[in-house]
């Protein structure tokens, strides 16, 4: 069997794997949409602010607020648990009702509004409320945001678009605690 016959017999997805120039041709002239860059920069800023707080939160709770290690763990666990549970439902809700932008907006708004509460907190209960609110916001925005990235990006650029958004997110996580 000749190379051409193998290519003709291969499924379309495999042909792209055999011929990288096909992918390059599909991508020619395509750009990652501004929406992806905007979501990436918002993720960068949110991660910077979240990681600044997250790095110092245990010290704040243990020091001025007098929280025990167990209580600090409960606050962190409740926050992360709230994020994980919310992620499941936000993705399904976004798909079912089609309100991706609204859920992303609400998720970021909840995160932004919870940040000043940490600075104003004079009790572990207030820190708990802020942490759970912040993490619910993270859970709300994650899946719908990724769906928006897919919806606005041409399919040949999906990898690049997700890479850009995630790289900016990771840069924020790196810079935040510094």
Describe the residue ranges of each PLM region:
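Helix-loop boundary and gating motifs at the non-cytosolic
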Residues: 26-80
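Glycine/proline-centered helix-kink
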Residues: 55, 173-178
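Helix-to-loop junctions at the C-terminal end of transmembrane segments
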Residues: 86-98
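Structural signature of the two symmetry-related core transmembrane helices
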Residues: 102-116
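Helix-loop junctions at membrane interfaces in 12-TM secondary transporters
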Residues: 117-130
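Cytoplasmic helix-loop-helix junction between adjacent transmembrane helices
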Residues: 130-171
């Amino acid at each position: 069997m000749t190379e051409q016959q193998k290519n003709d017999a291969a499924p379309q997805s495999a042909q792209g794997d055999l011929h990288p120039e096909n992918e390059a041709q599909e991508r020619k002239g395509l750009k990652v949409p501004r929406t992806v860059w905007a979501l990436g920069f918002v993720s960068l800023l949110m991660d910077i602010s979240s990681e600044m707080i997250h790095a110092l939160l245990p010290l704040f709770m243990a020091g001025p607020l007098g929280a025990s290690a167990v209580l600090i763990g409960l606050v962190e666990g409740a926050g992360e648990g709230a994020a994980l549970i919310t992620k499941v439902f936000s993705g399904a809700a976004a798909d079912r009702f089609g309100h991706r932008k609204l859920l992303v907006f609400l998720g970021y708004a909840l995160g932004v509004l919870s940040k000043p509460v940490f600075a104003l907190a004079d009790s572990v209960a207030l820190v708990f409320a802020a942490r759970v609110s912040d993490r619910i916001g993270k859970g709300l925005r994650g899946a719908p945001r990724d769906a928006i990235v897919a919806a606005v990006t041409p399919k040949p650029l999906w990898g690049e678009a997700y890479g850009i958004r995630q790289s900016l997110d990771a840069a924020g996580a790196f810079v935040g605690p510094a």
